[in-house]
Amino acid sequence: MNTIHATAIIDPGVTLGDKVTIGPYTVIEDDVEIGEGTRIGPHVHIASGARIGSACRIHAGAVLATEPQDLKYAGEKTQLIVGDRTVIRECVTLNRGTKASGRTVVGSDTLVMSYVHAGHDCVIGNHVVIANSVQFGGHCEVGDYAVIGGLTGVHQFVRIGRYSMVGGIARASLDVPPFVMAGGHASFRYEGLNSLGLKRRGFTAEKISMIKDVYRIIFQSGLLLSNALEKVRTDFPAEPEIVEILRFFDSGTHGRKFLRPFNS
């Protein structure tokens, strides 16, 4: 049985799972699907095209799946997809996709804190923590278990790799590879390996040491990036983490540059 406040406005075209709670003055448009056990607070607006998973919590004032802020958008039918058990705090805005990809995605078990904005076609992974007032341009990608500090601006098309941590009040204009820390406002830089985060997630000391050695070659050897990557391919076994790092650097798009070392 669902619990819907008398002042909420729910379009007949909305599909609700069981045990959904909807608070006062919330508006949910047609072509929306909301999974079992999701709780939606007061004054929330969920526009057409939203697909919300099970056991999510959506807090007061959040605005989800509204039209993308893109001059090329011409009314195409697109989506915002949110996974299971994700928490969306107060006044978050998540735009739906454009025809470029058709959807904006936020994964499962992710925490999106207050006043975060994610633009069209962003893909945010699982178990991600996004602190207050982070602002994503369109087409950004965030890997699983990444952490992004508050008040950070993430430029359109920037990719942030898995298990990475971006410091607060940063100007994230460069791609951030997996497993590292990055930060800086005037100059966005590599700040070392996210060793503590990796340890907390069960990475062994040997694995952490190997990843650190890889990034020492990439960022601190003085080699050109292409030569550094070739040295990594030659000197290290094809462990999954090494393959992931190399694939990240090999798959850069839109001319986006990578992080630079902190002493450059």
From Swiss-Prot:
Q: Could you state one GO biological process linked to this protein?
A: lipid A biosynthetic process
Region forming the signal peptide: none
> Which SUPFAM superfamilies does the entry mention?
Trimeric LpxA-like enzymes
As recorded in Swiss-Prot or TrEMBL, the protein's gene is named: lpxA
Q: What class of enzyme is it?
A: transferase
The role this protein plays is: Involved in the biosynthesis of lipid A, a phosphorylated glycolipid that anchors the lipopolysaccharide to the outer membrane of the cell.
Q: Which GO terms describe its molecular function?
A: acyl-[acyl-carrier-protein]-UDP-N-acetylglucosamine O-acyltransferase activity
Which coarse location class applies to the principal site listed for this UniProt protein? cytoplasm
Q: Which cysteines are joined by disulfide bonds?
A: none
Catalysed conversion reaction: a (3R)-hydroxyacyl-[ACP] + UDP-N-acetyl-alpha-D-glucosamine = a UDP-3-O-[(3R)-3-hydroxyacyl]-N-acetyl-alpha-D-glucosamine + holo-[ACP]
Q: Which GO terms describe its cellular component?
A: cytoplasm; membrane
- What is the protein name stated in its UniProt record? Acyl-[acyl-carrier-protein]--UDP-N-acetylglucosamine O-acyltransferase
Q: Where in the cell is it found?
A: Cytoplasm
For this protein, the record's InterPro entries field holds: Acetyltransf_C (IPR029098), Acetyltransf_C_sf (IPR037157), Hexapep (IPR001451), Lipid_A_LpxA (IPR010137), Trimer_LpxA-like_sf (IPR011004)
- EC number(s) of the enzyme? 2.3.1.129
Coiled-coil residues are none
Keyword annotations for this protein, in alphabetical order, are: Acyltransferase, Cytoplasm, Lipid A biosynthesis, Lipid biosynthesis, Lipid metabolism, Repeat, Transferase
* Family membership: Belongs to the transferase hexapeptide repeat family. LpxA subfamily.
Superkingdom, taxonomy of origin: Bacteria
Per the record, the pathway is: Glycolipid biosynthesis; lipid IV(A) biosynthesis; lipid IV(A) from (3R)-3-hydroxytetradecanoyl-[acyl-carrier-protein] and UDP-N-acetyl-alpha-D-glucosamine: step 1/6
